[in-house]
């Protein structure tokens, strides 16, 4: 104590050495997001970036997503696992925003292990957030029943993947969901809550058949297998961001136009697949978001129903579908195809703030004599400056196109921008100029080598 009886700091009261200084930001994450309706080739971009990454994360969605990665001529399919796990040096993290169907997780891993060496030792490389919600078999059954009801009542369904994603996110919002941390705590308490949730669904859908004891038995069998993988996700992420320098990659599932808030509602998924979902789905602040790469297919595709302004229900659409082998990885459904829509991508950019783009499947356009690009929407003859929220309005928009000359040259063997045909270069530059975002990669084939890097 000082003589005055008042212990005063020597610097006149400014005792905090950190006051007025911003705390250090730490490592920044690189984010890869779909800029259209999904199936843009995000897995390929992630696979490319994962070669140098230390950590690859999933922040939202469940096994409704489908990513295909080709390594050493082996085609691996990922739905729930971050596809970067294919790199043996990578730690894969499934964040709290992801919903996990445990049988699906292990089936997916085992299926890929049988295909090739890429996934050997995956269990020691996977970390799961304790706050992630669990998808139960009955969520998947409910998904199917809800689709049937929608079909009967309105004559149209949402085209869900029937993986239980909507029902589990609904349960999460209604605060009746169960999480990984609940499964690993008191199993008796977990069982009670599980039974209560099952009975709620039974009362809503009397035709629903739920094998409560069978499913609980199955869930109990996963406890010891997943326990070593589970961590407090927030603490784990904080340590990763503020520890040694690390290259951290976030692999977005689904895409901007499927986002629950910003997508073509109601024909959307049940999570935020735009950049905001990265922070809420991993438990990290926005200042740790670094590069945000938007993945754009050189034309547009969509699975299921919903407005699609540039859709080509004609020979062009069929050509794109056939040449692009446009069939869903998760559903096996044929994708609807149409011209590139820059109104839609500009909208996705407004939300996500893309720092660069990956333009995929350019080679699919190789045979077209001319290529159209949607550049504006008109409603009642008036150009509108925004992307309509209302589905009925979006159904009615008239698309204004710019027609560009094709290049009628096979680009699949091209490995540098300079080697591309002149008109293909012009197509890329046209996209960059209209969006004000640089194209960093151009995809001209399935393999890793067929991604041309521009800078």
Curated annotation (Swiss-Prot):
Pathway(s) per entry: Purine metabolism; AMP biosynthesis via de novo pathway; AMP from IMP: step 1/2
Annotated binding of Mg(2+), by residue: 39, 66
InterPro entries, A to Z: Adenylosuccin_syn_GTP-bd (IPR018220), Adenylosuccin_syn_Lys_AS (IPR033128), Adenylosuccinate_synth_dom1 (IPR042109), Adenylosuccinate_synth_dom2 (IPR042110), Adenylosuccinate_synth_dom3 (IPR042111), Adenylosuccinate_synthetase (IPR001114), AdSS_2_vert (IPR027529), P-loop_NTPase (IPR027417)
Natural source organism: Danio rerio (Zebrafish)
Alphabetized SMART domains for the sequence: Adenylsucc_synt
Low complexity composition bias: residue spans: 12-25
Molecular function terms from GO: adenylosuccinate synthase activity; GTP binding; magnesium ion binding
Pfam families from the UniProt entry: Adenylsucc_synt
Gene symbol of the encoding locus: adss2
Record-given protein name: Adenylosuccinate synthetase isozyme 2
Control of this protein's activity: Inhibited competitively by AMP and IMP and non-competitively by fructose 1,6-bisphosphate.
Keyword Cytoplasm: yes
Chain residues that bind IMP: 39-42, 64-67, 161, 175, 254, 269, 333
EC number, as in UniProt: 6.3.4.4
